[in-house]
Amino acid sequence: MTIMRKSHPLMKIVNHAFIDLPTPPNISGWWNFGSLLGLCLVLQILTGLFLAMHYTSDTTTAFSSVTHICRDVNYGWLIRYMHANGASLFFICLYIHIGRGIYYGSYMYTETWNIGILLLFLTMATAFVGYVLPWGQMSFWGATVITNLLSAIPYIGQDLVEWIWGGFSVDKSTLTRFFALHFILPFIITALAMVHLLFLHETGSSNPLGIPSDCGKVPFHPYYTTKDLLGAILLLMLFMTLVLFFPDKLGDPDNYTPANPLNTPPHIKPEWYFLFAYAILRSIPSKLGGVCALVFSILVLALFPYLHTSKQRSLSFRPLSQTLFWALISDLIILTWIGGQPVEPPYIIIGQVASILYFSIILIFMPMAGLIENKMLKW
């Protein structure tokens, strides 16, 4: 008799994806973040669903409804803070996941990589529209400033902005449509994540050595299910520490003030996970140039498979490229810091240098380092 998981149509899909999946025997803890992202997504959808039951997407009551959730709903404060900090956790895992992909050359699986970039764009869009929903000062002005960037698009820009707003300014209709988008996008992300997995399982995972491991693969269960479970427990411990002890650490105090179109906050800035892109946007004096740089700062990831010049896939044995990789990480940290600072000297010049360095490392230095390392291998 055939085992049910190998014969039942639905169980077979689960079996091929999570139980009998052939997996490289040497993948490290850095490969845990894919499953942790799945956990974050489930967590966000569940907490978001319960928040949506009590939230009202109307400009007059949105702020009050969030207050009502925190004060009057059973464990509403916990659900709200889990959802708000869950977004930060999501992006931490996302950035580590992308970093691991760059370090170990996972971008050579182009279909999986490109769907991943699309997932990143969708996650950023979801987080942006979600940040508008509490209708605090930073929500309102963040929505105004970021959507206004689209007016830089020649010819159709202004019409496009007014079409997104549903009027001549960010108002009731904007909030309603942002709520609708924030509700539907996570389900689109879930569907795309499944396609992401589908393409990954066509090729199999890469490994730290960057060499084929077909001859020594092991089944996913029990080896990596236990490893993923450990990662999930550690992540949840870290997450609950953040939620229960430092719930407002990553938020903006301005968002505890109800939105007021007549009073502009002294310094408008997005959530911390967008600050690096915001710094790149601000470092270019031209509005259209800034918007192009902002989009390209994420889209540049799609060029990685074509900029790979080395004969080795992974950076494990490439000290020159390793140095550049960590320089890129340091540069992103500097950009994140600059994005949260006011537009004044010396921050302006630091932001401009860091932005130039960001694109230079990816587009010029890393491909050059690959070629130099190829030469060194011949010696």
UniProtKB/Swiss-Prot annotation:
Heme b b566 binds at H97, H196. It is a multi-pass membrane protein. Its cofactor is heme b. It is found in: Mitochondrion inner membrane. One of its GO terms (biological process) is mitochondrial electron transport, ubiquinol to cytochrome c. Binds 2 heme b groups non-covalently. InterPro entries: Cyt_b/b6_C, Cyt_b/b6_C_sf, Cyt_b/b6_N, Cytb/b6-like_sf, Cytochrome_b, Cytochrome_b_C_euk/bac, Cytochrome_b_N_euk/bac, Di-haem_cyt_TM. GO terms for molecular function: metal ion binding; ubiquinol-cytochrome-c reductase activity. PANTHER family: CYTOCHROME B. Belongs to the cytochrome b family. Heme 1 (or BL or b562) is low-potential and absorbs at about 562 nm, and heme 2 (or BH or b566) is high-potential and absorbs at about 566 nm. Component of the ubiquinol-cytochrome c reductase complex (complex III or cytochrome b-c1 complex) that is part of the mitochondrial respiratory chain. The b-c1 complex mediates electron transfer from ubiquinol to cytochrome c. Contributes to the generation of a proton gradient across the mitochondrial membrane that is then used for ATP synthesis. This is Cytochrome b. It comes from Cratogeomys zinseri.
